[in-house]
Amino acid sequence: WAEGIHKFFITDDNFARNKEWESIFDRLIELREKEKIPIGLLIQVDTLCHKIPNFISKAKRAGVTRVFIGLENINPDNLAVAKKRQNKITEYRKMLLAWKAQGIFIYAGYILGFPGDTPESIRRDIEIIQRELPLDLLEFNILTPLPGSEDHKILWNKLVDMAAALNKYRLEHFVRD
């Protein structure tokens, strides 16, 4: 911060499940409130973080101004394919409103290209999201069987044609038929 840097991205893929989240937030709160160090944070969390007592309110006091949440999808069948049974659209709104109540910018990720997706189902899901979910920014990514992932192994074993160039596996390229 002495060099003018006061915005940070904590690159824990799910800060809410970090066993030390509360002690980290407590120290950041102390730096902000007692030592008046202007810290702003972006963190990544899961869709159930709002159920952890005091997590969101402490996040605000610790300097969280933006939160990234991997919604993955709203279609229950797609969430099952992604093995994200904990992600439920019925919880999404409640969780998002808890962040909104603290004035925190919500940046979410959404995956397109599940086996059951069609242009019509994607349009319908986007309309539901626009109507029901209070998001500030929604980023769309293509379902990508990243090398080393379970999806990639399954497709490889089924001899599905996939891109040989590893630089194509960046969530924005189609890498299979």
Regions found by a protein language model. Give the residues of each.
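Alpha-helix boundary/interfacial micro-motifs
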Residues: 29-30, 63, 87-89, 94, ...
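Conserved strand-to-helix beginnings and helix N-cap segments that scaffold or border functional pockets
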Residues: 21-22, 52-53, 118-123, 152
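C-terminal accessory regions of radical SAM enzymes
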Residues: 120-177
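Conserved SAM/AdoMet-binding glycine-rich loop
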Residues: 1-107, 112-114
